[in-house]
Regions:
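A short, structural micro-pattern
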Residues: 1, 50, 107-111
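Beta-strand elements of well-folded, non-transmembrane domains
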Residues: 9-13, 60, 115-123
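Glycine/small-residue-rich interface belts in oligomeric ring/scaffold proteins
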Residues: 21, 26-71
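Residue-level signal for secondary-structure boundary sites
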Residues: 15-17, 64, 123-125
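Residue-level detector of short, conserved catalytic/binding motifs and their immediate flanks
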Residues: 5, 54, 113
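Internal, well-folded beta-alpha domain core
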Residues: 71, 81-220
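N-terminal, Lys/Arg- and Ser/Thr-rich interaction peptides
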Residues: 1-23, 207
């Protein structure tokens, strides 16, 4: 049986990139389950436990804004690094003057969510690991604002603030909206085969401001 926790997260901007918009990025309407998992793993991660997202409460209304950002159009390939390591004489850097390109991004602004999640023990837990120990560490970190690395909303430049949520009744911006279909969204990545990592999707339906992920159908 998993051990549950509620975490409030908020920030100025978020970008949960849609895979079909590869050049000029556009965000999903709400946070993806994989982004929520990433935030919790930034607070606490251990090989002996696994996070699972139960619900995402959309506290603030969905608002978009468009910005233009400087990006680079190329990347350093692992094969190039290996060649240089083996003695090849070739540059191993990206010239921003030559590769810089300005691209538009459709971001979410003024975001706030409450993540309901639980963790489960894995086969990599040792004899000193137990749910009580992990929960004490997680609760202490959430109350103190401590993290392994700074959590973010989709992209590292969009910092996520976080704290423990101890409210029983969580108000959302869509309490009066019975149901809203958000279409297909990224659920997470399937890492079971490291040589063929596959995306998983689900049909996102927000009911009164809440995405319930406990029994959703996942499509590979």
């Amino acid at each position: 049986m998993g051990v549950g926790v509620k975490v409030r997260v908020w920030g100025n901007y978020a970008l949960f990139s849609r895979p079909e918009m590869k050049v000029e990025r556009g965000s999903y309407d709400v946070m993806t389950p994989s982004a929520a998992r990433g935030i919790l793993e930034a607070v606490y991660w251990h090989p002996g436990m696994r996070w699972a997202i139960d619900k995402i409460h959309v506290v603030n209304p969905v608002q978009f804004t468009s910005v233009r950002r400087n990006e680079v159009k190329s990347k350093i390939l692992a094969s190039n690094v290996l060649q240089v390591y083996n003695g090849a004489k070739k540059p191993l850097y990206i010239s921003t003057k030559a590769d810089i390109v300005q691209r538009a991004s459709l971001l979410l602004r003024d975001v706030e969510y409450v993540i309901e999640a639980h963790f489960e023990m894995t086969e990599r837990a040792n004899e000193t690991d137990n749910p009580g120990k992990f929960k004490d560490i997680i609760m202490r970190r959430l109350r103190r604002g401590e993290c392994f690395h700074m959590p973010y909303f989709g992209c590292r430049e969009f910092q996520a603030n976080f704290c423990l949520c101890e409210e029983e009744d969580i108000r959302t911006a869509y309490d009066e909206v019975e149901e809203k279909d958000l279409g297909f969204m990224l659920f997470d990545m399937d890492y079971s085969d490291r040589n063929s990592i596959q995306p998983m999707f689900f049909r996102a339906v927000m009911k009164r401001g809440v995405l319930d992920l406990r029994d959703c159908e996942v499509i590979r």
